[in-house]
């Protein structure tokens, strides 16, 4: 038996962690003794490296510790690097926004329990895994699936009807149709399964219970139509022949999914008017296509070329190939349904009936086109028309008041800037139908980068922040406009969103400082901080260099907002004092004097309150004393009456008692 040492040093418990002696082996190949077991508590993601380490230890006597161990170490390094780089990192939330929004709402689902606990937890784990395959109808994956299922539905609606009418189309591309038909059938079956795994909202929560999902879908009309659309009517091919695609007309019953895709796309798209027009055009083209196919089928049943109304005889080479057949029928259908006319008049009664029906459909199509397109164009131009009406009203007023041409040109340029930069939308009017919570969240998301730079909002309470954001009013200033002048009473504070402002001298030319996007001014003057050397007046002239987009918060709006948040008001005032102290604009003597005045006023108020309490206490004490006296008097009267009643009872008992009989 041979025992291996590491560098001539006997292994000990202290160094077993670094050097694991290999097991001793007999000549016959059997283990003489087993190596001491070492603890192996490894995570699931370390299984690979642990197995490689074990192989390295077993392979050490034959190959040495150098080469293979370096390979194992390299594999471990690569694995750690891959896990570190490919692990998805959650985006860090913005703390400023989280103070308002609060923690993220976790996904909550409803399910029916059976009231029985699983002994080993396997049933519960299986159900949880099964619930992972429930699609949220408001999610992106569900929308993508609607697109997938809409394609075979549209394929069947267009080509299945055409193949049933144009026999050449069916025969010439039979293999292609066979593949597409059964591919669409596969998608239909998959859609039926997905519908069984599509969640729905119950009391505002997404239901993922399989039984509820199944019952919710099976008891609907759509389930019956979906099942009817996948009935294997292709078996009729064995009776009527393979070139009879009309036996698959039940596939047209799956139309609801295509309409659902169109509805969701109209909601999701950023260009709803364009999509509505495209959708309307698609419907009209499908109707014209169907009408062309029906015209060809009627011509086939009557006979090609038997009169001037039907399709010409297909024996004529000019009209005997597939492309000419379809284009001719599509042309005839378009002329008829658009009521343009100029088509051969009908000859037979059935031809007259079909043309009358087509004319009625054409009138409805024309009315639909005019109505929908007119409505869409009106909606698209509504904003422009409203804005133009405002400009016309201002122009009329300036002409009536004989405003100078320079001022009129300035006003027109201001309106032009608003329209060019898409600043004509009234945010309050657009968002008025949303609840206050959503309006505030949208405002914070839109104006977050600007609000974060306002110093007095840094430690602002979330509720007050909501109130202030909703009260911000956008204002646009033209080049050369004064936002405020030195000595003016400050009634608003301003936050610069876009543009450049200059702090200028009284001459309006000399510039002292330049304010850019994110800067704010006037926030101290609206807080009425006592001891401020600035008071509530502006100390500088601020002028717009170009067109500037600002947010305005009035003093009245701020005071109205902080009325319900007295603690937040104190925080704002304290932060304002800190800013004034840093800038040397706080008069401490005046602050101390104001504090003394405040203390004196509070003492006087306290004395007044104490006097009021004393008066109320004296009145209550007098009422209590009077009530006690009345109570005592009533008790005395009751005692007197009780004594009198007792004496009367005693006397009556003595008179009515009979004398004892005398014994004779």
UniProtKB/Swiss-Prot annotation:
Membrane topology field: Multi-pass membrane protein
Positions of region (Disordered): 1-61
Start-end of Polar residues biased regions: 1-10
**Which reactions does this protein catalyse?**
Ca(2+)(in) = Ca(2+)(out); Na(+)(in) = Na(+)(out); K(+)(in) = K(+)(out); NH4(+)(in) = NH4(+)(out)
Gene Ontology cellular component annotations, sorted alphabetically: ciliary membrane; non-motile cilium membrane; plasma membrane
User: Which ranges sit in the Cytoplasmic compartment?
Assistant: 1-146, 200-224, 268-274, 382-664
For region Ion conduction pathway, the annotated ranges are: 272-380
Give the molecular function GO annotations.
calcium channel activity; calmodulin binding; cAMP binding; cGMP binding; intracellularly cyclic nucleotide-activated monoatomic cation channel activity; monoatomic ion channel activity; voltage-gated potassium channel activity
Q: Where in the cell is it found?
A: Cell projection, Cilium membrane
Q: Does the record's keyword annotation contain Ion transport?
A: yes
According to the record, the signal peptide region is none
Site positions (Central gate) are 366, 370
Question: Quick one: where's region C-linker?
Answer: 382-458
Family membership noted in the UniProt record: Belongs to the cyclic nucleotide-gated cation channel (TC 1.A.1.5) family. CNGA2 subfamily.
The record's comment about this protein's domains reads: The C-terminal coiled-coil domain mediates trimerization of CNGA subunits.
Q: What is this protein called?
A: Cyclic nucleotide-gated channel alpha-2
Q: What organism is this sequence from?
A: Mus musculus
């Amino acid at each position: 038996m041979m025992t291996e040492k590491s560098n001539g040093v006997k292994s000990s418990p202290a160094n077993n962690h670094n050097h694991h002696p290999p097991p001793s082996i007999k000549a016959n190949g059997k283990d003489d003794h087993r190596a001491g077991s070492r603890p192996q508590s490894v995570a699931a993601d370390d299984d690979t490296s642990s197995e490689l380490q074990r192989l390295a230890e077993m392979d050490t006597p034959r190959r040495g510790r150098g080469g293979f161990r370096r390979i194992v170490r390299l594999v471990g390094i690569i694995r750690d690097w891959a896990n570190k780089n490919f692990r998805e990192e959650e985006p860090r939330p913005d703390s400023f926004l989280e103070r308002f929004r609060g923690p993220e709402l976790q996904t909550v689902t409803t399910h029916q329990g059976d009231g029985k606990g699983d002994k080993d937890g396997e049933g519960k784990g299986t159900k949880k895994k099964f619930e992972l395959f429930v699609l949220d109808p408001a999610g992106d994956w569900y929308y993508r699936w609607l697109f997938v299922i809409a394609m075979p539905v549209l394929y069947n609606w267009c080509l299945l009807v055409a193949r049933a009418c144009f026999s050449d189309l069916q025969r010439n591309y039979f293999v292609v149709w066979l593949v597409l038909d059964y591919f669409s059938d596969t998608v239909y079956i998959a859609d039926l399964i997905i519908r069984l795994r599509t969640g729905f909202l119950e009391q505002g929560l997404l239901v993922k219970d399989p039984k509820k999902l199944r019952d919710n879908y099976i008891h609907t009309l759509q389930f019956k139509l979906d099942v009817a659309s996948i009935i294997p009517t292709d078996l009729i091919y064995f009776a009527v022949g393979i070139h009879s695609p009309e036996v698959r007309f039940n596939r047209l019953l799956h139309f609801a999914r295509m309409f659902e895709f169109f509805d969701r796309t109209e909601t999701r798209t950023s260009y709803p008017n364009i999509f509505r027009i495209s959708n309307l055009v698609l419907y009209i083209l499908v109707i014209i296509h169907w009408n062309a196919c029906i015209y060809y089928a009627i011509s086939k049943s009557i006979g090609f070329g038997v009169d001037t109304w039907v399709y010409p005889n297909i024996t004529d080479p000019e009209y005997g190939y597939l492309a000419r057949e379809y284009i001719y029928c599509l042309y005839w259908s378009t002329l008829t349904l658009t009521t343009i006319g100029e088509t051969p008049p009908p000859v037979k009664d059935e031809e007259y009936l079909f043309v009358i029906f087509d004319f009625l459909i054409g009138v409805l199509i024309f009315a639909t086109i005019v109505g929908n397109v007119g409505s869409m164009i009106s909606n698209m131009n509504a904003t422009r028309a409203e804005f133009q009406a405002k400009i016309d009203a201002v122009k009329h007023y300036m002409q009536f008041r004989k405003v100078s041409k320079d001022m009129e040109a300035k006003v027109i340029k201001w309106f032009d800037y608003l329209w060019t930069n898409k600043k004509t939308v009234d945010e309050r009017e657009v968002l008025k139908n949303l609840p206050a919570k959503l309006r505030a969240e949208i405002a914070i998301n839109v104006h977050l980068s600007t609000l974060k730079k306002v110093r007095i909002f840094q430690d602002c309470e979330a509720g007050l922040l909501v109130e202030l954001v909703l009260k911000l009013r956008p204002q646009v200033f033209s080049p050369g406009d004064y936002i405020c002048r030195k000595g003016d009473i400050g009634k608003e504070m301003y936050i610069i969103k876009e543009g450049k402002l200059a702090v200028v001298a009284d001459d309006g030319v000399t510039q002292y400082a330049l304010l850019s996007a994110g800067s704010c001014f006037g926030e101290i003057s609206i807080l009425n901080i006592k001891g401020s050397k600035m008071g509530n007046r502006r100390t500088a002239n601020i002028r717009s260099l170009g067109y500037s987009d600002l947010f305005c918060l009035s003093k009245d709006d701020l005071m109205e907002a902080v009325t319900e948040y007295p603690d937040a008001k104190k925080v704002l005032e304290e932060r304002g004092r800190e800013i004034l102290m840093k800038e040397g604009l706080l008069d401490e003597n005046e602050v101390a004097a104001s504090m003394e005045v405040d203390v004196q006023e509070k003492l006087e108020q306290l004395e007044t309150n104490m006097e009021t309490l004393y008066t109320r206490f004296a009145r209550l004490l007098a009422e209590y004393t009077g009530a006690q006296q009345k109570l005592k008097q009533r008790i005395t009267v009751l005692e007197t009456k009780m004594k009198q009643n007792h004496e009367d009872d005693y006397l009556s008992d003595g008179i009515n008692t009979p004398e004892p009989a005398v014994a004779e």
